[in-house]
Every structure is written in structure tokens, then in C-alpha cells.
């Protein structure tokens, strides 16, 4: 009888997923590369990268543990994972739509709107992750890998939020500030890559504390 192949969710896989997704976003939004390959190719890279994010976020949600702690309160770790997972799905919609959306309405409703909503959810996710640190007294632990990871991740969320604001679709079908949108997307992607890379050396199969 053949042995069943099974991939077990782990922090290492989560980190690798976010790092792979971040690489695609960083390459697609990096000015010289984006100019060389064109917007269509960049959009394809974003779409591929968004699925790296979604896969990693799904693993994170699985590892986050129960929704509530023993006192019945919603756990910050679960809130961070769940909001991020939904945000990545919205990025799937946005980046996928960007490949074929040509009308102004399509760009506004199918590309920018889910991008903005996903960015808001990423900001909430980053805030919940910091709340989880605060609940265990680690909100200021600069030498701690988790502290570094969470704050760098929050910086990435802020960068993605700025990108969404800069990418508002104008009346002629362009974006408000294409250069700012691209560079903050690239910065955010680099932050997300670094946030995962910093904890990868110590990644194991453990889940978060059920209390936070």
C-alpha cells in the first residue's frame, strides 16, 4: 500500500508562502522591472503573488487555534489571522481583475475597491497582531524575533494602505499617483518578506498560545 502524501500546516510553510508571494509583488512593482516588462506582465506577477499570500494566510489561520480563549473573549491571534486571510482573498479578486479590466467602472469596482478593502483588513490584522504582543507583555521587546516580525509586518500593512490610497482610479481611468502606488507596494512587499524571513530560522510546528 502506498504511503499517503500529506502536507502538514506549519509556521515554516506559512513563512515561505508569504515570502514567495512578497517576491512576486516586489518584482512586479519595482520601477525599473515594471517599466521593462509592462503593466500586463506586472499584473500577472501580482496575481500569482496574491495566491502565495492566500495560501500562507490560510495556514496561519489553521495554526492560530481556537476563536476564543477560556474566558470567552476573541483571541487577538485568531483575529489577526482571520482578517488577513479575508484580505488576501480580496487581493486575489483585485489582482485577477486587473489582468482583464479595461473600463473605468471595472477598474474602480473590481480592481481598486477590493484592493482598498484588502488593505484595510491588512491594517486591522497588523493591529490585532500587535495587540497579541501587548497581551503577553511583549509590545516593546526589540531583541525578540516576534516583536521585529510583527512591527515590520505592520510597516508593510501601512505601505500597502498608502498604495491603495495612491491607486484611486481617476475619471480618465488612470490612477491618482502611479509612482507612489508602485513604490509603496514594493516597500510593503519587502516588509512582508522580511517579517517572515526574520522568524523562519526558528519556525516550527507550534501554534499560538490559546490565551492571546
Residue ranges and their predicted role:
Residues 13-20, 41-52, 76-86, 107-124, ...:
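Physicochemical signature of membrane-embedded alpha-helices that form the seven-helix bundle of GPCRs
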Residues 1-10, 31-37, 59-78, 97-108, ...:
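Juxtamembrane membrane-water interface segments of multi-pass membrane proteins
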Residues 28, 56, 91-94:
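Alpha-helical transmembrane segments and their immediate juxtamembrane boundary regions
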Residues 5-54, 61:
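The feature marks the first
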Residues 158-161, 168, 190-193, 197-200:
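Hydrophobic alpha-helical segments
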Residues 87-96, 155-170:
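Hydrophobic alpha-helical transmembrane segments in multi-pass integral membrane proteins
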Amino acid at each position: 500500500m502506498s504511503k499517503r502524501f500529506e502536507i502538514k500546516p506549519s509556521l515554516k510553510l506559512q513563512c515561505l508562502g508569504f515570502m514567495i508571494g512578497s517576491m512576486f509583488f516586489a518584482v512586479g512593482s519595482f520601477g525599473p522591472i515594471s517599466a521593462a516588462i509592462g503593466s500586463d506582465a506586472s499584473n500577472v506577477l501580482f496575481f500569482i503573488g496574491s495566491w502565495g499570500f492566500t495560501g500562507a494566510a490560510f495556514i496561519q489561520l489553521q495554526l492560530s487555534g481556537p476563536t476564543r480563549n477560556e474566558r470567552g473573549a476573541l483571541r487577538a491571534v485568531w483575529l489577526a489571522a482571520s482578517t488577513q486571510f479575508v484580505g488576501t482573498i480580496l487581493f486575489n479578486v483585485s489582482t485577477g481583475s486587473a489582468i482583464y479590466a479595461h473600463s473605468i467602472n471595472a477598474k474602480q469596482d473590481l480592481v481598486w475597491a477590493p484592493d482598498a478593502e484588502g488593505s484595510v483588513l491588512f491594517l486591522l490584522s497588523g493591529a490585532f497582531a500587535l495587540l497579541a504582543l501587548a497581551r503577553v507583555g511583549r509590545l516593546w521587546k526589540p531583541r525578540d524575533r516576534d516583536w521585529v516580525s510583527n512591527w515590520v509586518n505592520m510597516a508593510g500593512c501601512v505601505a500597502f494602505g498608502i498604495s491603495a490610497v495612491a491607486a484611486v482610479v481617476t475619471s480618465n481611468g488612470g490612477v491618482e499617483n502611479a509612482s507612489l502606488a508602485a513604490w509603496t507596494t514594493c516597500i510593503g512587499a519587502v516588509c512582508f518578506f522580511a517579517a517572515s524571513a526574520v522568524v523562519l530560522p526558528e519556525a516550527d510546528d507550534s501554534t499560538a498560545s490559546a490565551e492571546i
